Regions:
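Juxtamembrane membrane-water interface segments that cap and precede transmembrane helices
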Residues: 123-140
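C-terminal ends of transmembrane helices
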Residues: 18-27, 83, 161-163
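Membrane-water interface of transmembrane alpha-helices
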Residues: 155-159
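Membrane-helix boundary/juxtamembrane motif in polytopic membrane proteins
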Residues: 138, 160-167
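Individual alpha-helical transmembrane segments in multi-pass integral membrane proteins
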Residues: 2-15, 28-118, 138-151
Length: 167
C-alpha cells in the first residue's frame, strides 16, 4: 500500500511540474501570474510531501515539513486572489495584507515548531502490525489554519458559483 501512495504522490508532483510549466508559457497577465504562483506553491507542497513520506527519521520529516509549509501556508490565499481576479471582484488591499500576514505567521509557526507546542504538541512513531507511521498531535495553529483555509476555499467556491451564474 505504501508503494501505491508513493507512486500516486510522484504522479501528482509530476502533474504539478507540468502545470507550472504550462502556466509559465501562457501570455503574461496578472491572472496568469496568480495562477503560476498557485501552481508553484502546489508544486512545493507536493514535492515536499513526496520527500516527507519517504523520510526515515523524525528530524528529516520535521525539516521537510518546514519546506512543505512554504506552499501550504500560501496556496489558499493566492487561489482566493485568483478567484477574485477571475470573477472581476475587488478585494480591499488591507484584507490581502491581513491574509498574507496570517500566512506568514503560520509558516513561521511551522518553521519554529521545535521551540513551542503551538504547531505540534507531540510527534512520535507508532507501530501497528508491520506498519510504522508517524503520529502527530496537532497544536492550536494547525486547527486555526484548517478553519482559515476552509473559509478561503468556501469563498473560492462561492465566487466560482456566483461567476458561473452571472455568465
Amino acid at each position: 500500500m505504501s508503494q501505491g501512495i508513493l507512486i500516486f504522490q510522484a504522479i501528482v508532483t509530476i502533474a504539478c511540474i507540468a502545470f507550472v510549466l504550462a502556466a509559465g508559457i501562457q501570455k503574461s497577465n496578472r491572472l496568469s501570474k496568480l495562477m503560476l504562483i498557485v501552481a508553484f506553491l502546489c508544486l512545493i507542497e507536493n514535492a515536499a510531501y513526496l520527500m516527507e513520506i519517504q523520510a526515515d527519521s523524525i528530524s528529516a520529516i520535521l525539516l521537510i515539513m518546514k519546506l512543505r509549509y512554504i506552499g501550504v501556508a500560501f496556496i489558499d490565499t493566492f487561489f482566493l486572489l485568483f478567484c477574485m481576479r477571475y470573477t472581476h471582484k475587488k478585494i480591499p488591499k488591507h484584507l490581502v495584507g491581513v491574509m498574507l500576514v496570517v500566512d506568514i505567521l503560520v509558516m513561521i509557526s511551522a518553521w519554529t515548531s521545535q521551540y513551542h507546542s503551538l504547531f505540534y504538541r507531540d510527534i512520535y512513531y507508532v507501530t501497528a502490525g508491520s506498519l510504522t507511521y508517524l503520529h502527530r498531535v496537532y497544536g492550536p495553529v494547525i486547527y486555526f489554519n484548517s478553519v482559515y483555509e476552509t473559509v478561503q476555499i468556501f469563498a473560492c467556491a462561492y465566487l466560482a458559483l456566483k461567476g458561473w451564474r452571472e455568465a
